[in-house]
Amino acid sequence: GQSVDGTTVTFTYSDKGDGDYTSDGPTFTDAGTYTVYYKAEAANHEPATGTFTVTIDPLPISLLSVSSISKTYDGSADVTLTADKLTFFSKTAKATNIKLPDTALSFSNAQFTKQQADGSYLPSPEVGGGKALSFTMMLTSNNYVFEGKSGGTTEVSDVFATDDANRFTITKAAAP
């Protein structure tokens, strides 16, 4: 502890005003603002109490890469996309290879697409490779926001194009 006039002062902390106080501060892992309660106690002195706040900001992230995805021809360009297929980075945290839990993201409109002459992307349900992946992703966890987007955006539509002709493919269905 600290000392005042040679008297040792012991600081203890809790995440509840009427909770158990310990010498270790409370541990918070999710983004949000938290109140920490403290007590300063010393022999022959009245305890002093107070609070301070701890704020954990959401981690700003950007899409870094998408793993290979292949499916068997079913006449549709629709793709099942899961969080484990995506890798993110954060300029703010100077971190790469960030993997999000499945509970942190949801997807819609995930489709294999092909770039057209005008630069647009259209669904591409035919067999073969050389495709791009178009999708909308929504963050379902308050622990993340998309970096570089206004006001902590939690939904973005993206086209992930690659020079790897085998990254996104549709294979022929087995003959009946």
Question: What function would you assign to each model-found segment?
Answer:
Residues 1-176:
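Short loop/turn motifs that initiate or flank beta-strands
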